[in-house]
Structure formats: structure tokens, C-alpha cells
Amino acid sequence: EIVAMKSLIASDKFQNSKMELPIALGKTISNESLIADLTKMPHLLMAGATGQGKSVGLNAILVSLIYKKHPSQVKFVLIDPKKVELTIYNKIERHFLAKLPDEEEAIITDTTKVVNTLNSLCVEMEARYELLKEAMVRTIKEYNHKFVQRKLNPEKGHKYMPYIVLVIDEFADLIMTAGKEVETPVARIAQLARAVGIHLIIATQRPSVNVITGTIKANFPARIAFRVSSKIDSRTILDAGGADQLIGRGDMLFSPGNELIRLQ
């Protein structure tokens, strides 16, 4: 049975959700819609062999956020080494996509530019921490609440902070071409950025140890596994077997940190 995106978005659970960044992931075995909150995750790691629905899952996540959020509330940074997967999103460039001032393309396909983007995200992260420190709050949610109630002075550099969602479509490809240069900022962002509203979503085909290193893995408690080719791959991503026995085509295991939930 095909689970249509429409049925998830139309579900009461999604329509009435009070989550900060709701994501419609799929339906459970008991046919209930599963809606997760990206801010609670705080970062998401997806893996699966070719043609098992990774890109579809990625699109589902992006569509959920675009549907529920105003462009002032969330911005995306899309990194797409495959060049074609995320190009449909350049239509919303002026609204939803964040980019470096000197770039022409909003969706980064060139691996050499990725390092610049990641480093500038680190800078943005540090700048946001400074603002939080001045506002004497702990999280971006409290900060924006305070700002909306006019308790912070814009002349001192305070501004409404949108969430930033960084999506990397083929992580293995980046590691092959740039290696440590990419890994270090990604690990830094993963460790520190959740309080200032920067969230990572990483998709990769081969969940091998040299791609998903220990540091990265430690900071991604939430994981989604589509069908993978071997039990070893399944263990690498979920720390448990089972992803090698999925049917494929959108059949996935979602692990929000402690349990395994099977979704379609």
C-alpha cells in the first residue's frame, strides 16, 4: 500500500501539531501517522541503499517544514553533491533558502564551496550564541519569545532568529572529496548548534565507519534507516540489526534515540 504524503499532511495530528519544527515521517504498523519534532531530535541521520527512498524521505521532511512554517521562521541550507535531487527547491530560493552573499546558486552542488558554507554556518552559530548570552536566555525559543514581546533592542543587533535546517544529501561523497575539512565543522555544528536553532539532516548511501565517524554518530541520536545491503551496515547506523531485512521502497526503521519504530 502506498502511503501518500497528502494523507500525512492532512492528518489532524500534523495539522494541529504545536511542535516547533514538525516532520511527517510516515505511518506506523498500526496505521497511525507519525509526526516527529526536529527540534527535539536535534539532528537526523538517514541511510539506505540506492533506490530505497532516501531522497523521498528527505523531500517529505522538507515539504512538512515548508507547509507548516512561514519563511521568516525557518531557512534551509541545501547541499546536494548529486546535483539533481534538490534542484526543485530553487523555486523557493527567495523565501526559504539561506545562502552566502557572493553565491549565485542557492543550492550548493559544488563540493569546494561546501567547506565555505559550513564554516560560515559555524560563524553564524557563534554569533547567535553571543546574542543569546546578551539576552540571557538558553534557547532560541526563549530568545524569539523575548524578542516578539519587545524586550530586546534591535539597535544592539538583536533580530528574530529563524531556525536553520542544513540538509546534506550525499554525505559519503563529501567525505570522499573533502574529508576532514567537512567533518570538523559538521561535528562542531552537531555538538553546539541545537540551542541556537541550527539543525542538521544528513543522508548517505553507505553507512560505513569511515563516512559516519564516531564523533558524528555520537551527536546524531535520531536515525532513520532504509533498507541497507548488509547486517554490518544496519549495525553501523542503528546499532542494531534489522535494516537489512526491510522490504525496501520506503520501508524504514526510525530510531528517535532509544526505541525502534517501523514506518512506511
Which role does the model predict for each range below?
Residues 143-144, 154-156:
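Charged, low-hydrophobicity low-complexity segments
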